[in-house]
């Protein structure tokens, strides 16, 4: 009985080690354009051709129109840099304010097209 149990455990471990895969998130985080007033972080997933642009600045200085313009300009440049020809938005943009750090974040979710 002990041999059968040991054999069963070894088989289970062998099957598990063969089928187990690492679950890494394929994000590449690029922090670009750090300025005195704002910064932009880009999380790009090449496998899915998706990008998330995160614009952040001080809450007192935040203007949504400026955020849209800056993110759109950076998005156009990023699209050309990566060899894509167009893009579309995956979902509506999100604006969040962190009152503890007095920062406002503007999120834009994009699907890049070839």
Predicted regions located by residue number:
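Sec-dependent N-terminal signal peptides
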Residues: 4-13
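C-terminal segment of classical bacterial N-terminal signal peptides
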Residues: 14-19
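Secreted/extracellular ectodomain signature
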Residues: 20-114
